[in-house]
């Protein structure tokens, strides 16, 4: 495979809250000199503008509120970018659940145990609310897309790694 062909393949990086998906996406974007799109920044911006905290108890409440309003639009934007552009790394919770294993997208899903995720978030206020946030995301993704976000069999079916 030549260099031009490799640049046509995009990366989709996903993972459970606190898994390190954003960190991995930024590292890969730097190493492979690719544009990095962090979908979480859209939600963080909206949350700040609407008076929700990015961390702690407000985060699960905001996720539950905002997903129904803009979730599908943002998810469809993510799919469009991955399937129609080149040389991208996209960090989004559930993109590969929707597009599956696609020849244009190499998808990675990070699924560390809950204790590991809590350790990673130990310095953040949101650590104590990760269980609640997991439940909210699981419910919202199931309602919006029929995605079983914490089902490891589904994760393995839909992601390359």
Predicted region positions:
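ATP-binding Walker
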Residues: 19
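P-loop (Walker A) phosphate-binding loop of NTP-binding proteins
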Residues: 16
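Small-molecule kinase domains that catalyze NTP-dependent phosphoryl transfer to phosphate-bearing small molecules
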Residues: 127-161
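Walker A/P-loop
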Residues: 22
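ATP-dependent small-molecule kinase phosphotransfer cores
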Residues: 39-100, 115, 126-131, 135-136
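Conserved phosphate-donor/acceptor-positioning beta-strand/loop module used by diverse small-molecule
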Residues: 102-124
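Hydrophobic anchor at the beta1->P-loop junction of P-loop NTPases
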Residues: 13
């Amino acid at each position: 495979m030549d260099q031009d062909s490799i640049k046509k393949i995009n990366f989709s990086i996903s993972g459970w809250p606190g898994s390190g998906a954003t960190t991995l996406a930024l590292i890969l974007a730097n190493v492979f000199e690719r544009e990095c799109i962090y979908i979480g920044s859209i939600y963080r911006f909206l949350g700040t503008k609407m008076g929700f905290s990015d961390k702690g108890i407000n985060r699960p409440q905001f996720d539950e509120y905002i997903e129904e309003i803009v979730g599908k639009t943002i998810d469809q934007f993510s799919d469009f970018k991955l399937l129609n552009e080149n040389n991208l790394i996209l960090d989004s919770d559930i993109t590969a659940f929707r597009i599956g294993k696609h020849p244009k997208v190499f998808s990675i899903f990070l699924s560390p145990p809950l204790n590991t995720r809590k350790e990673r978030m130990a310095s953040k206020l949101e650590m104590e609310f990760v269980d609640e946030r997991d439940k909210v995301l699981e419910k919202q993704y199931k309602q919006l897309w029929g995605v079983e976000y914490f089902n490891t069999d589904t994760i393995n079916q839909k992601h390359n790694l």
